[in-house]
């Protein structure tokens, strides 16, 4: 009985070991699989078991290896059968080239060394310039100064806007005091504010009603905003955003509000911000304007620098400006880029308009400028300048409607001329009738062409803020504090001090847009001495 049971167990053990990869026993097969060697065989990798030496070397069983190609696509089982027993000395053991042995629970294992790839950081880009370092540092400093100067110019432009608004607020209070009976009952000297009020009344009479004409006021506002803007954006576009700012009652100055303040995201449908930023008027400096200077030689208009005769083209309009020093400038108008104000950087002129010339021979002139609004006196001043320089005015057309000259007949051109002429004539007649009795009692103003407003701007860059000096000192100080340009503001205070509140806007009357001082800024008309 015992013999039969032993035979059964031996047979079962043999079956199990044979099915389990033909190893003698599972424990030995497990240990043998932990130790293996790789050797190159016919372009492939052959994995063979490196068996441990058992006590009975005569008992050998077939060994199994796994042959795999380098691509690992197909694996093949290779069975090696030993026909003869091998002695311990004759047994060949395949080992790696440099095995590293490590003791782990009494077993010898091969150590596989894995080399980690070295990650090399990218080489930093070194800016190379042929210019010396000192020159590069100077360029960086210049760039910082340019940005800082632009920021300062914007603050100064805002100062001009603020002092103009504050002036209207003070002027309304002065006008209210002047209209009261108590003002005349008290014996006191007339203040500077009251003189400003009387100056406004006088300016409205001698200026053909400019302060009461809405059309002229709008054009004057456009001229002013364009002149003081550091970028000289087209005044026609600026004044639409100026109206939005006035209605918003914002406590921020206009240009700060427009560029980086609460209004930086305002985009009007009919006047988009992209057009506002694109259309910037070029203001010429003293050297730049020399290229547009025109002289008269033998009765013909000739460019002084290039000595070429003036020729008007059909697809553009030739514009001219006569400076206060009686220097003539002629150029081609480009809407939103180059216009009458470009020649003298927005400064005052004697005459302005358009002309047509062929080979230097003057054929037509027209006193039209939506920027300067020239009057008949300005036109006569220009004609006298031409006659003094021996220009034959016999065949020169002096009207705006003429079929022979396409420059005067383009669509919208005659329409603008008609509107401007009506805007100039209508208020003039009205004011003469209203103030007729008062004019009889006062002395008639005397025109003096030699004395003009202080609007001589030579530089083509920067805002035109000289008009701020003409305001009372108290308003100047308050305006500087409003835009944080006053040294009296503490460093810890905010940019816009709250005690002053919003800038007084909109103005008292929708028809009054700018003060008389700014209304006449740059307009080429004879000035009068206002005796306050």
UniProtKB/Swiss-Prot annotation:
Highest taxon in the source lineage: Eukaryota
Subcellular location: Cytoplasm; Nucleus
InterPro entries with a match to the protein in the record: IQM
Biased composition (Acidic residues): 85-94
Compositional bias per record (Polar residues), positions renumbered to this chain: 487-496
Known tissue expression: Expressed in roots, cauline leaves and flowers, and at lower levels in rosette leaves, stems and siliques.
GO biological process: cellular response to hypoxia; response to abscisic acid; response to salt stress
GO molecular function: calmodulin binding
Domain IQ: 136-165
Biased composition (Basic and acidic residues): 56-66
Keyword vocabulary terms for this entry: Cytoplasm, Nucleus
Composition skew (Pro residues), residue ranges: 499-509
Single GO cellular component term: nucleus
Induction summary: By hydrogen peroxide. Induced by light. Down-regulated by salt stress and treatment with mannitol.
Region entry Disordered, spans: 47-67, 85-104, 410-443, 487-513
Stated role: May be involved in biotic and abiotic stress responses.
Protein name per UniProt: IQ domain-containing protein IQM4
This protein's encoding gene: IQM4
């Amino acid at each position: 009985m015992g013999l039969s049971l032993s035979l059964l167990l031996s047979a079962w053990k043999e079956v199990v070991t044979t099915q389990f990869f033909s190893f003698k026993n599972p424990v030995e097969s497990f240990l043998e699989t932990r130790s293996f060697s790789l050797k190159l065989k016919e372009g492939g990798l052959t994995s063979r078991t490196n068996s441990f030496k058992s006590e009975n070397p005569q008992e050998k069983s077939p060994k199994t290896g796994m042959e795999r190609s380098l691509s690992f696509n197909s694996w093949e089982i290779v069975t090696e059968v030993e026909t003869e027993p091998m002695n311990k000395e004759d047994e060949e053991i395949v080992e790696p080239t440099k095995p590293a042995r490590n003791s782990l629970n009494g077993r010898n294992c091969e150590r596989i060394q894995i080399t980690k790839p070295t990650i090399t950081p990218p080489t930093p880009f070194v800016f190379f310039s042929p210019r010396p370092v000192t020159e590069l540092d100077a360029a960086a400093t210049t760039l910082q100064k340019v940005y800082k100067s632009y920021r300062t110019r914007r603050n100064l432009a805002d100062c001009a806007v603020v002092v103009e608004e504050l002036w209207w607020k003070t002027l309304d209070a002065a006008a209210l005091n002047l209209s009261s009976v108590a003002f005349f009952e008290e014996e006191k000297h007339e203040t500077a504010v009251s003189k400003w009020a009387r100056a406004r009344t006088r300016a409205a009479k001698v200026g053909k009603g400019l302060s009461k004409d809405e059309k002229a006021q709008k054009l004057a506002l456009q001229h002013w905003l364009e002149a003081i803007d550091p970028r000289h954006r087209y005044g026609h576009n600026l004044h639409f955003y100026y109206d939005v700012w006035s209605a918003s009652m914002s406590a921020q100055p206009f240009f700060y509000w427009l560029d980086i303040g609460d209004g930086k995201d305002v985009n009007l449908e009919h006047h988009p911000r992209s057009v506002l930023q694109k259309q910037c008027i070029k203001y010429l400096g003293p050297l730049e304007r020399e290229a547009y200077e025109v002289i008269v030689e033998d009765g013909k208009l000739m460019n002084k620098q290039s000595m070429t005769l003036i020729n008007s083209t059909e697809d553009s309009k030739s514009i001219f400006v006569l400076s206060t020093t009686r220097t003539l400038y002629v150029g081609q108008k480009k809407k939103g880029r180059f216009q009458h104000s470009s020649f003298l950087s927005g400064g005052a002129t004697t005459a302005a308009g358009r002309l047509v010339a062929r080979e230097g021979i003057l054929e037509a002139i027209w006193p039209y400028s939506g920027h300067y609004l020239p009057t008949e006196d300005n036109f006569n001043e220009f004609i006298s300048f031409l006659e003094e320089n021996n220009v034959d005015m016999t065949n020169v057309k002096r009207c705006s409607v003429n079929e022979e000259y396409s420059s005067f007949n383009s669509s919208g051109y005659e329409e603008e001329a008609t509107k401007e002429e009506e805007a100039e004539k209508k208020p003039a007649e009205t004011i003469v009738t209203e103030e007729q009795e008062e004019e009889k009692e006062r002395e008639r103003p005397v025109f003096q062409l030699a004395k003009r407003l202080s609007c001589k701007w030579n530089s083509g860059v920067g805002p035109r803020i000289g008009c701020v000096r003409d305001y009372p000192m108290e308003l100047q100080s308050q305006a500087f504090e409003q835009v944080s340009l006053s040294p009296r503001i503490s460093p810890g205070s905010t940019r816009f001090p709250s005690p002053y509140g919003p800038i007084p806007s909109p103005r008292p009357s929708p028809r009054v847009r700018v003060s008389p001082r700014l209304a006449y800024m740059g307009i080429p008309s004879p000035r009068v001495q206002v005796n306050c």
